[in-house]
Regions:
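Conserved small/polar residues in nucleotide/adenosyl-binding loops
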Residues: 138-140
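Post-Walker A helix-loop "phosphate-sensing" segment adjacent to the P-loop in P-loop NTPases
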Residues: 18-27
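ATP-dependent small-molecule kinase phosphotransfer cores
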Residues: 29-90, 96-100
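Walker A/P-loop
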Residues: 11
Length: 140
């Protein structure tokens, strides 16, 4: 599991690691967040509306789920179980709430927390993403 505040560099690090080892599979989370420019449904996230997400949660489709900055995120139980059945390793790019839930389910999982280079750099990254809002500043 790789966890970090928004803008710390999780995705960059995960993409480098995935490019080096084809045996690693990235879990693509479900979210109610709107896609950012350049994001593709099913690649960065599975983008769903709140009603669909809640129905999935009610059915037990998620191993973990969390509300982060007003949006819902969840990890697919079926996908994780399918990859485990193939004896492949999984990378979860996940927030601290999800990481805590997953550690309870998989206590032997390796957890990596990434810190941003500095608070000013983190703020710069968040502003460049268009997160120059109260929520964006709350990250810092």
């Amino acid at each position: 599991m790789v966890s970090a505040p928004s803008g710390a560099g999780k995705s960059t690090l995960v993409n480098v690691v995935l490019a080096r080892d084809a045996r690693l599979k990235l879990s693509v989370s479900y979210t109610t967040r709107a896609p950012r420019a350049g994001e593709v449904d099913g690649r960065e996230y599975h983008f769903v509306d709140a009603g669909t997400f809640q129905a999935m949660a009610d059915r037990g489709d998620f191993l973990e789920s969390a509300r982060v900055h007003g949006n819902l995120y969840g990890t697919s139980r079926r996908w994780i179980e399918g990859i485990q059945a193939q004896n492949l390793d999984i990378i979860l790019e996940i927030d601290w709430q999800g990481a805590r839930q997953m550690r309870r389910i998989f206590p032997g999982a390796v957890t990596i927390f990434i810190f941003p280079p500095s608070l000013p750099e983190l703020e710069r990254r968040l502003r460049s993403r268009g997160k120059d809002t109260e929520i964006g500043r709350a990250h810092v």
